UniProtKB/Swiss-Prot annotation:
Intrachain S-S bonds: none
Free-text function comment from the UniProt entry: Catalyzes the condensation reaction of fatty acid synthesis by the addition to an acyl acceptor of two carbons from malonyl-ACP. Catalyzes the first condensation reaction which initiates fatty acid synthesis and may therefore play a role in governing the total rate of fatty acid production. Possesses both acetoacetyl-ACP synthase and acetyl transacylase activities. Its substrate specificity determines the biosynthesis of branched-chain and/or straight-chain of fatty acids.
Protein name: Beta-ketoacyl-[acyl-carrier-protein] synthase III
Keyword Cell cycle: no
Pathway in which this enzyme or protein is active: Lipid metabolism; fatty acid biosynthesis
List of catalytic residues: C123, H256, N286
GO biological process: fatty acid biosynthetic process; secondary metabolite biosynthetic process
Region described as ACP-binding: spans on this chain: 257-261
Phylogenetic lineage: Bacteria, Pseudomonadati, Pseudomonadota, Betaproteobacteria, Burkholderiales
Keywords (A to Z) from UniProt: Acyltransferase, Cytoplasm, Fatty acid biosynthesis, Fatty acid metabolism, Lipid biosynthesis, Lipid metabolism, Multifunctional enzyme, Transferase
């Protein structure tokens, strides 16, 4: 008897934002005390961001991941002990090691010995994590995966650099992906080009207990914008081709929530109406690997995304990395 084809399917979503919501005006007032000039109008015009959330000093990335994961597990209706794969996409882990995924596994009380590891692809990290989990499930190695994007980017921001500190926020989003005979994830595409590593990076490193170089995020905004608008349409089209779908068959586009101008540019190039694009950058800022699952959960919980609809996620991040996935919700 022929063995049925395995797919991976989204069972549930969850997200969490730390309670400290910082508006542009509040951030502007804080920066003014340091002699840094900016304004709500300047930030909104260039990014579309109105507010972001910052984690308290004693809250870690794994803490944010835990709250988002609990909500995704509840929404999926699965037993945590059935989760045999945990992948956390983050660039701001609790420690150099152990991985945030292992810390999360322990905090969830999962004792089944399943695999747990981090993926570091910055803002495209969740697309990388979803494609990786999908491959593991399709191969039969794992059946139920918890994939999380979680960040505390406020820890690596230089609040004397107005071009970067106004952009980012903290948060976490999670998805339960499970083996299914029904198609779920339909196609993915991942790429990287390390020759662009210097345009978005934290150039410092720890050498024998001493930080060598700057530990703060550095970004060449114009170079990032130019690269992003060039690669995002291409990787989205590639993922759609693998899914045997045309852009007009996509019900919802969930781009990495980096900058409203980049997002609308990609949406327009794909020929999709703006109404089909999920936007949370205005209230969350850029939460790096957390942005896509945060936006996905928001659109699921408010009823926009319905079962059976096609969703396209795409993102680009430091490395440089970029990726996209298409799935039927």
């Amino acid at each position: 008897m022929a063995q049925s084809t395995l797919y991976s399917r989204v069972l549930g979503t969850g997200s969490y934002l730390p309670p400290d919501r910082v508006t542009n005006q509040q951030l502007t007032d804080r920066l003014a005390k340091e002699g840094i000039e900016t304004s709500d109008e300047w930030i909104v015009a260039r990014t579309g961001i109105h507010a972001r959330h910052f984690a308290a000093p004693d809250v870690t990335t794994s803490d944010l991941a835990l709250e988002a994961s609990r909500r995704a597990i509840e929404a999926a209706g699965v037993d945590p002990q059935s989760i045999d794969l945990i992948i956390v996409a983050t660039s701001t882990p609790d420690f150099v090691f152990p991985s945030t995924a292992c810390l999360l596994q322990n905090k969830l009380g999962i004792k089944n010995g399943g695999a747990a590891f981090d993926v570091q692809a910055v803002c495209s990290g969740f697309a990388y994590a979803m494609a990786t989990a999908d491959s593991f499930i399709r191969s039969g190695q794992h059946r139920t995966a918890l994939i999380v994007g979680a960040e505390t980017f406020s820890r690596i921001l230089d609040f004397k650099d107005r071009t970067t500190c106004v952009l980012f926020g903290d948060g976490a989003g999670a998805v339960i992906l499970s083996a299914s005979e029904e198609p779920g994830v339909l196609g993915s595409a991942l790429h990287a080009d390390g020759s662009y590593s210097n345009i978005l990076c934290t150039p410092g490193n720890v050498n024998r207990g001493v930080i060598d170089g700057s530990a703060f995020l550095h970004m060449d905004g114009q170079a990032v914008f130019k690269l992003a608008v060039n690669v995002l349409e291409k990787v989205a089209i590639e993922a759609l081709a693998k899914a045997n779908l045309a852009p007009e068959q996509i019900d919802w586009l969930i781009p990495h929530q980096a900058n409203i101008r980049i997002m609308t540019s990609t949406c327009r190039k794909l020929g999709l109406p703006q109404e089909r694009m999920v936007v949370t950058v205005d209230q969350h800022g850029n939460t790096s690997a957390a942005s896509i699952p945060l936006a996905l959960d928001a659109a699921v919980r408010d009823g926009r995304i319905q079962r059976g609809q096609h969703v396209l996620i795409e993102g680009v991040g430091g490395g440089f990395t970029w990726g996209a996935s298409v799935f039927r919700f």
